[in-house]
């Protein structure tokens, strides 16, 4: 059944209701912070945001007597928006709970536009983005390339992960092999695993240990199942594929951080079906295709759009086989999806 399209007035009304609810929640939160700060608060200490719940976050104490304990904290009104992975300074309350008083500088952040097109961080201090795909739902190179551009733009190392490798069969093997070969030729690290059967999971654990990683990928590729396999005993509601569409049904409802025994962390974020890159410029997309980098600036015309222009270094490389046709098609598709001024 097709999804019903909202009119502009309906969309405005929904947005207005959400704003009113957010304002009421912020007012209640402000009163809660005032009550906490009116009592006795403990000393300032460092903490790690491991989950975000609207106007409150869960903080894991990193030092002091409470080290390792998790506390639900309120945020001071003057703080910027916090996300899972943020490191903060907080103070514990005498009735439980606590107050976050400062955000520590981020080493990196992974961002995407929200429904209004405004840039919104989704995870902080990540140093590895694991791009998960599977034989089902059918993987699309364009979506993988969008994630790679986002990773390159954020300065976060990507790892390509084919999950549900046990579902590879005669019908999809050739297409998957061609897809994987494209990225292997570019030098991207790639692993094949089966969370259900356990194949390749030790290699994946070794690749994640010592890093702060985030799993991304369309719904239904098994991100929550991977977490359950990597961290037995952790409950991340596992969903199934829709029998009608073959697409994934969303499961995880909030980004959450988990610790690995080897010292690394994993941020499990909500499944997303379409990753928008509306916040990047044309130059960012070009730089996100790593095989373009040595060619950029060598076209005959400074404002070359790499379409039909004579003397284009990228088109020459495409003709010579140094750029794969699939990647050039993805590049053009991504550019076409950008806001008009950036295209």
From Swiss-Prot:
Alphabetical UniProt keywords: Cytoplasm, GTP-binding, Hydrolase, Metal-binding, Nucleotide-binding, Ribosome biogenesis, RNA-binding, rRNA-binding, Zinc
Keyword flag ATP-binding: no
Cofactor binding: number and manner: Binds 1 zinc ion per subunit.
Gene Ontology molecular function terms on file: GTP binding; GTPase activity; metal ion binding; rRNA binding
GO terms for cellular component: cytoplasm
EC number from the UniProt entry: 3.6.1.-
Pfam family, one: RsgA_GTPase
Record keyword Amino-acid biosynthesis present: no
GO biological process: ribosomal small subunit biogenesis
Binding residues annotated for GTP, in chain numbering: 163-166, 217-225
Location in or out of the cell: Cytoplasm
Residues that bind Zn(2+): 299, 304, 306, 312
Self-association state and partner proteins as the record states: Monomer. Associates with 30S ribosomal subunit, binds 16S rRNA.
Role noted for this protein: One of several proteins that assist in the late maturation steps of the functional core of the 30S ribosomal subunit. Helps release RbfA from mature subunits. May play a role in the assembly of ribosomal proteins into the subunit. Circularly permuted GTPase that catalyzes slow GTP hydrolysis, GTPase activity is stimulated by the 30S ribosomal subunit.
Name of the protein this chain belongs to: Small ribosomal subunit biogenesis GTPase RsgA
Taxonomic source organism: Azotobacter vinelandii (strain DJ / ATCC BAA-1303)
Name of the gene encoding the protein in the UniProt record: rsgA
């Amino acid at each position: 059944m097709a999804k019903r399209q909202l009119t502009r007035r309906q969309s405005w009304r929904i947005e207005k209701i959400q704003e009113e609810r957010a304002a009421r929640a912020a007012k209640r939160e402000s009163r809660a912070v005032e009550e906490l700060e009116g009592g006795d608060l403990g000393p300032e200490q460092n903490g790690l945001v491991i989950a975000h719940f609207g106007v409150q976050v869960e903080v894991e104490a990193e030092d002091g007597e409470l080290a390792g304990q998790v506390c639900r904290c309120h945020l001071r009104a003057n703080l910027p928006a916090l996300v899972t992975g943020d490191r903060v300074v907080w103070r514990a309350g005498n009735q439980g709970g606590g107050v976050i008083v400062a955000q520590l500088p981020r080493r990196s952040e992974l961002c995407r536009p929200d429904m209004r097109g405004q840039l919104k961080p989704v995870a902080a201090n990540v140093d590895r983005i694991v791009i998960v795909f599977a034989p089902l739902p059918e993987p699309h190179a364009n979506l993988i390339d969008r994630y790679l551009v986002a990773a390159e733009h954020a300065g976060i190392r990507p790892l390509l992960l084919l999950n549900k490798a046990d579902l590879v069969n005669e019908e999809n093997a050739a297409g998957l092999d061609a897809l994987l070969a494209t990225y292997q030729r570019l030098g991207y690290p790639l692993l094949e695993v089966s969370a259900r059967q356990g194949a390749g999971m030790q290699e994946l654990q070794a690749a994640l240990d010592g890093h702060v990683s985030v799993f991304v990928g369309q719904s239904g590729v098994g991100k929550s199942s991977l977490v359950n396999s990597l961290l037995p005993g952790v409950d991340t509601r596992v969903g199934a594929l829709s029998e009608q569409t073959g697409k994934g049904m969303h499961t995880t409802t909030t980004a959450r951080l988990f610790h690995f025994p080897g010292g690394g962390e994993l941020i499990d974020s909500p499944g997303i079906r379409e990753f928008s890159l509306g916040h990047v410029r044309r130059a960012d997309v070009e730089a996100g295709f790593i095989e373009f980098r040595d060619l950029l600036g060598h076209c005959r015309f400074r404002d070359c759009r790499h379409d039909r222009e004579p003397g284009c270094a990228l088109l020459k490389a495409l003709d010579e086989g140094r750029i794969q046709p699939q990647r050039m098609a993805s590049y053009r598709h991504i550019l076409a999806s950008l806001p008009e001024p950036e295209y």
